[in-house]
Amino acid sequence: MNPHATPVLVLSLALGTTITISSNHWVLAWTGLEINTLAIIPLISKSHHPRAVEAATKYFLTQAAASALVLFSSMTNAWATGQWDITQLNHPTSCLLLTAAIAIKLGLVPFHFWFPEVLQGSPLMTALLLSTLMKFPPLTLLLMTSKSLNPALLTTMALASAALGGWMGLNQTQTRKILAFSSISHLGWIAIILVYSPKLALLTFYLYTIMTSAVFMALNKIKALNLSMVLTSWTKTPVLNATLMLVLLSLAGLPPLTGFMPKWLIIQELTKQEMTPAAMAIAMLSLLSLFFYLRLAYHSTITLPPNSSNHMKQWYTSKPPSTPTAILASLSILLLPLSPMIHAIV
């Protein structure tokens, strides 16, 4: 790929995201989603490997179908009510169609099948964009229409996402697929609270973005695409691997790390809404995700690779991690004491 193309594509992603999150008209929001889709496809397929081309094709087909559903949903609503305003989604059929369309774009169960395959075929930094930035515009549309959505449908999809994200991640050895199922599981937590507290859903997404970005940047630094590569990287980057372990434990939601905050607040809010069974179910389902986070953390720090070397650490190490990785890792680990202030601001 032309080296000048990447900045143009990244700017296009920023433009598409900005158009979608700042628009009140359905056609403008749809335009932003399409700009995002067309900008990310070259980044997915830039290695020209058959798996990357396959991932780009799968991504294009699913996103095109989802965008068509978004447009059809908005047209159905406009036909029935005469409104093109995003916040005026009042027609019940339009609400169901939009929920399905956004679920496809986000990768919520039962529309999740494309997401792990696309992430597996993408470079690590493109996978980071797919897991974080590309989910922000569709999530914004859900937040803007949250008062019109069906709570029972979203709760069902959320619990299914938490269950399947944890269950399918158990037997994975590829780091990108593990993080794909992690993303599906976290989307379940966001979806279950979306109708009752949109601001808390947004806070959960922000914290998920910080933690996932730190993990992807660390994995990109040590070039770890599977568990065995994570296993052998300790001798070269011990500090980064130790930090990666803490960020993974935070992503799992263990106290006293940052990732515990959104789970704690969501369970508290669900209990206030008299949804104690749903809160208990999603809390129990998060234990499935905890297992593969612990396995990844265990491989990154506690075990050593089987080799004939009689020393624990190589005499040379890689360059120190970049400043963004250090900042994101610190935020991923240390934000829990600030949770009262963050919750008050939200």
Curated annotation (Swiss-Prot):
EC number: 7.1.1.2
Transmembrane segments: 1-21, 25-45, 60-80, 95-115, 124-144, 149-169, 178-195, 200-219, 242-262, 274-294, 326-346
Originating species: Mareca americana
Name of the protein in question: NADH-ubiquinone oxidoreductase chain 2
A molecular function GO annotation: NADH dehydrogenase (ubiquinone) activity
Keyword rRNA processing: no
InterPro entries assigned to the protein according to its UniProt record, in alphabetical order: Complex_I_Subunit_2, NADH_DH_su2_C, NADH_UbQ_OxRdtase_chain2, ND/Mrp_TM
Membrane topology, record value: Multi-pass membrane protein
GO biological process: mitochondrial electron transport, NADH to ubiquinone
Subcellular location: Mitochondrion inner membrane
